[in-house]
Amino acid sequence: MNEDPSHYALNPSSDLVKRASKVTKAESARKGEPKFHMTEDMRRLSTPWSISRVRAEQIQATDLPAGVILDAAAGSGVQLIALTTGLKRPGLAIELDPNIGLLCAANMQITGEESDLQRTMDRVLVGDGTDAENAITAYWNSLREAGTRAHPPIGMLHLDPARPRDAQRHEIDEMQPALGPLLKAWANHLETGPRGPAVLLDLSPRLNEDQRSLVDATIETTFPGIPRTWEYLSQGGGRIDRLSVWIGSISSKEPSRCIRMGKKKIMATI
């Protein structure tokens, strides 16, 4: 464990898995899916593995700038794990709650392959996801103490901010961590490809048009002129179940797309 004034690093290991197992055992949400350590509350809030995996499959590894994949509010780590294992990149998770951070680190360990050298650079930082300067320093220090001299940049940023519980609607500034400050804090640490940095935002599907416009304005303020694609994902029933924004290097040619998701794969894209 690497101590820092504002962050400390957890290096995924079998020891952390043992500690996590004392909190909650690893279970699969569905037959054939990976097992994860999650409390009931975490399981309720976590993105399903099938959706997380499909998102990773939509990204071409060659489109990503060089560097690690960062999840600045990682929670259980399911989406980050799907991205890092699918795209063969190291993962950096940041989680404010130390108890959740422990489970996230354990999940990174049990889903990784020992032969995959990328996994030796996986870390979970317990601390504030908006404090980019101290977070990246803590990450690099942890790598150095483990014998890795590299100072990898951030190749992709993922953010799924917490929203008010049981709220049918919420305001943009109620997201935690706050979207604007977080994007601004990490902007200078993101590697840039031909279409800009790679950022994936996972938002509430209940955002109305005005709220989506505020998100667009926040993105434009941080990354002027950057391309983005709004994705509306439905699992049936005539409703939108997931809303996300694919920014920069992972955007498509269209400003929006609708996806019909089956149990395990995309059924149609419009």
Mark where each language-model region is.
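Conserved SAM-binding motif I beta-strand of class I
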Residues: P90-E95
